[in-house]
């Protein structure tokens, strides 16, 4: 009952306050609903993102995206905006987990095009490496003296601007169009536009 009380309390203080939780597995609907959290981390799609590029099997992420956000009645998170990410404070950074570093911009392109609320982990916008260790996460949480912007940073900025200007990318339905091992084409469609 704590989450329900927290949601009610925060909405009284600030109606547009968003509650986002970290949920590693299970049915996100149990905690992401009109009475509890507004959103939570989407670990299923996180795993599908890097794994699809490492195995060159776009069927994996396409399956997860359709299962979660497709238009079929059985799709489980239609209309929800889960927090999507390519890395965070608990997992090996994208620059360290991808076997082909040329796929880093592609992974960000997919992140910004898929349903959800894209979240960037500090330092990853310039491809900072960092591997999760069995006994600590220090490599995932470095202290930077200053930012290290590069071409990837500029590319991600462009993707963010495109997403911000697109109702379909922010709120639209999801539909797989073409799925091959090395290619994934999907459609995002809202009442205002189709991408």
Question: Positions of the model-derived regions?
Answer:
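Active-site-proximal helices and loops of the catalytic beta/alpha 8
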Residues: 1-76, 110, 129-158, 188-189
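Active-site-proximal substrate-binding groove within the catalytic cores of carbohydrate-active enzymes
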Residues: 69-172
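Sequence-level motif detector for i,i+2 pairs with an aromatic at +2
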Residues: 36-38, 80-81, 89, 139, ...
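Beta-sheet entry/capping signal
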Residues: 9, 16-18, 81-83, 117-120, ...
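Carbohydrate-binding surface patches
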Residues: 177-195
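Intrinsic-disorder/low-complexity regions
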Residues: 41, 86-87, 175, 180
């Amino acid at each position: 009952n704590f989450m329900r009380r927290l949601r009610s309390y925060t909405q009284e203080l600030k109606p547009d306050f968003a509650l986002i939780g970290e949920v590693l597995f299970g049915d996100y609907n149990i905690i992401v609903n009109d009475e509890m959290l507004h959103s939570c981390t989407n670990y299923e799609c996180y795993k599908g993102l890097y794994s699809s590029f490492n195995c060159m099997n776009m069927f994996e992420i396409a399956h997860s995206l359709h299962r979660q956000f497709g238009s079929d009645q059985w799709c489980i998170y239609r209309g929800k905006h889960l927090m999507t990410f390519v890395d965070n404070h608990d997992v090996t950074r994208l620059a360290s987990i991808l076997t082909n570093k040329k796929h880093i911009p592609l992974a960000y392109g997919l992140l910004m095009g898929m349903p959800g609320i894209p979240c960037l982990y500090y330092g990853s916008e310039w491809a900072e490496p960092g591997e999760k260790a069995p006994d600590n996460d220090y490599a995932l949480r470095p202290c930077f003296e200053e930012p290290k912007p590069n071409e990837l940073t500029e590319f991600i900025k462009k993707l963010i601007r495109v997403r911000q200007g697109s109702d379909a990318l922010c709120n639209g339905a999801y539909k797989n169009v073409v799925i091959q091992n090395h290619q994934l084409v999907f459609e995002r469609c809202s009442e205002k536009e189709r991408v």
